[in-house]
């Protein structure tokens, strides 16, 4: 059984945490994130460590304990280091480009697919077959990357599509002739 919630989080220098009711605000060199946490979980900041505690050992409180601790740890990492996801476009004629603040994908449809840049995210296209998404919120970065990947997920026969960098696509064999 996981005991993530019992681990203390080390707060790096330059990062400041404030709690007002159920709202936790983390401020650091890369920005500021505010998130609400479960009201049954209490957070104590002692020096350069944040500790979390729960009132009892019910299954719901145990789950919220670990989730809350992980969310706050991700907030701290986001404002100090940031998060980054890289995507690759594999396929003949598959291209990505930036037009102003719009990401434009040409991935085999009769029309280009456009995405507006989200608030708090930096989208870059280093070359025509790679997309880089950076931000301080792990959830926002991952959601936006998943939304882009969902336009044309990698197919198992030729491996064409949009994939995360380093993602291994399980390949299938084609039909055999008679």
Curated annotation (Swiss-Prot):
The keyword Ligase does not apply. GO terms for molecular function: rRNA binding; structural constituent of ribosome. SUPFAM superfamilies: Ribosomal protein L6 (SSF56053). InterPro entries: Ribosomal_uL6-like, Ribosomal_uL6-like_a/b-dom_sf, Ribosomal_uL6_a/b-dom, Ribosomal_uL6_bac-type, Ribosomal_uL6_CS. One of its GO terms (biological process) is cytoplasmic translation. GO terms for cellular component: cytosolic large ribosomal subunit. Transmembrane segments: none annotated. PROSITE patterns: RIBOSOMAL_L6_1 (PS00525). Pfam families: Ribosomal_L6 (PF00347). Keywords: Ribonucleoprotein, Ribosomal protein, RNA-binding, rRNA-binding. Disulfide bonds: none annotated. Gene3D superfamilies: Ribosomal protein L6, alpha-beta domain. Belongs to the universal ribosomal protein uL6 family. This protein binds to the 23S rRNA, and is important in its secondary structure. It is located near the subunit interface in the base of the L7/L12 stalk, and near the tRNA binding site of the peptidyltransferase center. Part of the 50S ribosomal subunit. This is Large ribosomal subunit protein uL6. It comes from Oenococcus oeni (strain ATCC BAA-331 / PSU-1).
């Amino acid at each position: 059984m996981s005991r993530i919630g019992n681990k203390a989080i080390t707060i790096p220098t330059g990062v400041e945490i404030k709690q007002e009711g159920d709202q936790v605000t983390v401020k650091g060199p890369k920005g500021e994130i505010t998130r609400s946490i479960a009201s049954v979980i209490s957070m104590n900041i002692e020096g350069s460590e944040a500790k979390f505690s729960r009132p009892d050992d019910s299954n719901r409180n145990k789950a919220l304990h670990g989730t809350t601790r992980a969310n706050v740890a991700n907030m701290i990492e986001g404002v100090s280091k940031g998060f980054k996801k890289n995507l690759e476009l594999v396929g003949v004629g598959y291209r990505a480009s930036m037009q102003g603040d719009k990401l434009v994908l040409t991935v085999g449809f009769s029309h280009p697919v456009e995405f507006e840049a989200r608030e708090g995210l930096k989208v870059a296209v280093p070359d025509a077959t790679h997309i880089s998404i950076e931000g301080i919120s792990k959830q926002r970065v991952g959601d936006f990357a998943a939304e882009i990947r969902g336009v044309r997920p990698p197919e198992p026969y030729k491996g064409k599509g949009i994939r995360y960098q380093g993602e291994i696509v399980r390949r299938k064999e084609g039909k055999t002739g008679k």
